[in-house]
Amino acid sequence: MAVVGVPGWIGSSAANETGQRWMSQAAGQLRLGVPCWMSQFAGRSREIIHTLGADHNFNGQWFRDRCFEAGSAPIVFNITGDLVSYSKDVPLFFMYGDTPNEYVQLNIHGVTMYGRGGNGGSNSPGSAGGHCIQNNIGGRLRINNGGAIAGGGGGGGGGYWNASITRYRYRYVVGGGGGRPFGAAGGYSGGSASTAGTLTGAGIGSKPGNAIYGGNGGNVGSAGGAFGGISGSRYGGGAAGYAVIGSAPTWQNVGAIYGPRV
């Protein structure tokens, strides 16, 4: 809801909107300085505030749904635990151009928001890491970053080792490591296994021979490593995801950033 327009019962409407009977206090809830005219209350809304704790498999559609529930009212998201997107293909936090709010305030309280890590390749390139924030509302998105914003690390490159040209007669699919965080490991067919990324580190590539290895996954904001070997098909690692992609927000505090940003 919002305070009614002029003409209308602005005083009672402002009290219902803000929960404040004193108009000086209602003005504060509506982000107006005192003194002010009550007519300035018309059409304004109090901030809608949400707080989120840790979730390592988070669907960013939740943010979008809360924005549309609030209508044109300004909305505040307080992040108090590490958040990781559920998919490398979906940004953790996305504000498309049709977002209706007066502004969107994102406060990060000493924690990290992550795009998901890219997958390691299986006789193929590593996939790109996921973006953390996609912003298409320009300065209406206000970011106060008291923690970190991290693009997902790229997946490591895989390959195919044709060992028959050496003194061995085996052929191996070589897998790349998953990017940080939680990028899946690439497939492999021999030697030490490739590993997935975790919240705290990137995965490593498989290793079928002393000089043959899949690329390691990238750390947050970094590309994955390339396949290393002397024969067979060799592929590169995936690119890092963006910390913030799209249009530039209003940066109230940039904080720690891992990966490209606008």
From Swiss-Prot:
GO BP annotations, alphabetical order: adhesion receptor-mediated virion attachment to host cell; symbiont entry into host cell
Motif interval(s): GRM 6: 188-194
Motif (GRM 1): 115-122
Annotated keywords: Host-virus interaction, Viral attachment to host cell, Viral tail fiber protein, Viral tail protein, Virion, Virus entry into host cell
Site (Interaction with the fiber protein p37): W9, W22, W37
Pfam families (UniProt xref): GP38, Gp38_N
UniProt short sequence motif GRM 8, positions renumbered to this chain: 213-219
Positions of short motif GRM 4: 167-180
Motif GRM 2 positions after renumbering to this chain: 124-131
Family under the similarity heading: Belongs to the receptor-recognizing protein gp38 family.
Known role: Receptor binding protein (RBP) that is at the tip of the long tail fibers and serves as the phage recognition site for the attachment host receptor. Probably uses the host receptor OmpA.
Misc note: This phage use outer membrane protein ompA as a receptor.
Record protein name field: Receptor-recognizing protein gp38
Organism of this sequence: Enterobacteria phage M1 (Bacteriophage M1)
